[in-house]
Curated annotation (Swiss-Prot):
It catalyses: tRNA(n+1) + phosphate = tRNA(n) + a ribonucleoside 5'-diphosphate. Phosphate binds at residues 86, 124-126. Phosphorolytic 3'-5' exoribonuclease that plays an important role in tRNA 3'-end maturation. Removes nucleotide residues following the 3'-CCA terminus of tRNAs; can also add nucleotides to the ends of RNA molecules by using nucleoside diphosphates as substrates, but this may not be physiologically important. Probably plays a role in initiation of 16S rRNA degradation (leading to ribosome degradation) during starvation. Homohexameric ring arranged as a trimer of dimers. It comes from the Bacteria. This is Ribonuclease PH. The gene is rph. Belongs to the RNase PH family.
Length: 237
């Protein structure tokens, strides 16, 4: 039995609120249960030096957690003078995932920077960030098309992500913090709207997991992401 009385395959309620802030070309508040992440997409003309003259764009991401997004206050990373390895890993994951969804040639020599700030954390912050960032990205691309900066839509498909894991011997979908902290296996899965894999991050925190359990977890993720994509589409409609 899960602490929240959800069934093994049941995700938390997902809410996506667009145009959450006034200034960014795309902005979204995404909520996976009690996990809340603000995702903004900033569109700028020009690309990093390593891409100049290549006729293609760039999408990158930054990620951070507010000091009191967790149960006890943590120092801002700026105050510590450097980002943690976890932060660097997560923002690279977000950037990689979003780049998979964009035709960089169609983007032209333009850059989109995604900022994901965790307001409240209850497990699954990186998967919520990817899900919300995708919608913010869509809005930023639509803004650029509306301004005549882009002729064609560079978006190839929507992407979303969810966590899965083995908790008390049972594969489950969309772990909240209490489950994540006690899980024997923890996995984050990023997929396209058609169910193709973009990234799988999986670790046996306790007992090693079997091939059969891996397949079961991926099926749970596919089911969960399908439902999350439906929420994205409803938000964008």
């Amino acid at each position: 039995m899960r602490p929240n009385d959800r069934t093994p395959a049941q995700s938390r309620p997902v809410t996506i609120t667009r145009q959450f802030t006034a200034h960014a070309e795309g902005s979204v508040l995404v909520e996976f249960g009690e996990t809340k992440v603000l995702c903004t997409a900033s569109f700028t003309e020009g690309v990093p030096r390593f891409l100049k003259g290549k006729g293609q764009g760039w999408v990158t991401a930054e990620y951070g957690m507010l000091p009191r997004s967790t149960h006890s206050r943590m120092d801002r990373e700026a105050a510590r003078g450097k980002q943690s390895g976890r932060t660097q890993e997560i923002q690279r994951l977000i950037g990689r995932s979003l780049r998979a969804a964009v035709d960089m040639k169609a983007l032209g020599e333009n850059t989109i920077v995604i900022d994901c700030d965790v307001i409240q954390a209850d497990g699954g912050t990186r998967t919520a960030a990817i899900t919300g960032a995708c919608v913010a990205l869509v809005d930023a691309l639509n803004w650029a098309r509306g301004k005549g900066i882009l002729k064609n839509n560079p978006l190839k498909f929507l992407i979303a992500a969810v966590s899965v894991g083995i908790y008390k011997g049972e594969p489950i979908c969309d772990l909240e913090y209490i489950e994540d902290s006690e899980a024997e296996t923890d996995m984050n899965v990023v997929m396209t709207e058609t169910g193709k894999m973009i990234e799988i991050q999986g670790t046996a925190e306790g007992e090693p997991f079997s091939h059969e359990e891996l397949l079961s977890l991926l099926e749970l993720a596919k089911h969960g992401i399908r439902e999350i994509v439906d929420v994205q589409k409803a938000a964008l409609s």
